């Protein structure tokens, strides 16, 4: 409906009623106009009707939705299922062109506009969460590991002689495989134990730079968000080292948008030294389905290089999901989710510490990790050599997801490299432990039920001379699950 159509409507319905409808329409259009003009996440969230109006307006700009379109090419946005078409709001062409994921498609002005506005809104959110000097970013329809691979492949063209990537150890398979998949040799830098925390071994990083030579080193691959007792890398010091030796620096910021501490580390690292790109997951930070990531950096030209190395067009689904989510939440709604997460981190730490004390364990002191917590399992291991691993399976079968039990002495081979003490980020961490995290979307009910079930499992495992059937019988029924929706309320 445009102004002319509203005027014609006055022949059929009272003019005062039509004008009221026109004013309502203009309210939606004003929000859309502001978004297109500023390219920023709106302060307050939009209604679903405004979002759907906007998406439908974008869809009619794509050639597959032209009323008189005649397509004779091999890719014409045809979809056999109307359900699939509705799932994608009839935005079928995806994003980018064969030579650049950020390029505009002549046949898909609406999808191209979706891509541009999503990248702009996401850039605004990265700034408001703490990395204020970030200059460019784009959403890529791959998860964190493959997005890191894309960054490494881009650096290959800049540093053709380079063979090695210096990587402070974090026991997570995808980030290790991202380097191997790109064709490089990871140089694993073992962490150093400071109190309970595992921290970056800066001296070893510098020794490896001198050993292999800066010209043979593709980059330093550091990490912010991670499982305790490992803590975020010393980004400022690593960034200074990279600037000193003229070595690129890629940061795995997988779920680091949530805590301001991780974003502050990136901002400070870029200020005092060198950070070329940082990569973050969409699902971990923006509560959307798995399948997308944000590649961001401080040099617009380098970020464009990364986007141009992506071969072919790409799915628009991750871009569509995160745009809908951020328009629904608005900047204020998203900041509230972050504030709630931070508050519940303190609550989780308090509850886990109290539970640990009741069972002769302790909460490991990891103040530099803003998301993940760890509770020792020394007494449980002393009671039974198999109890630690059994605890993990018991929690999973009792519908406690995300809790991570780490025994001692596990060996794991990943892409040809054998890690000792795998999952603990260290060859010889002093004790087994259990991880729990306060990530975006967690509720107080999650914490309460988790503590009840964990406490019951620990009590059962410490009962001596009980067979598995007895343990299951004593466990009884599951406590009532926290009443929750799959949708977040802000």
UniProtKB/Swiss-Prot annotation:
Belongs to the SepSecS family. It comes from Danio rerio. The keyword Lipid metabolism does not apply. Residues 469-480 have a biased composition (Acidic residues). Its main location: cytoplasm. Substrate binds at residues 97-98, 105, 313. The gene is sepsecs. This is O-phosphoseryl-tRNA(Sec) selenium transferase. The keyword NADP does not apply.
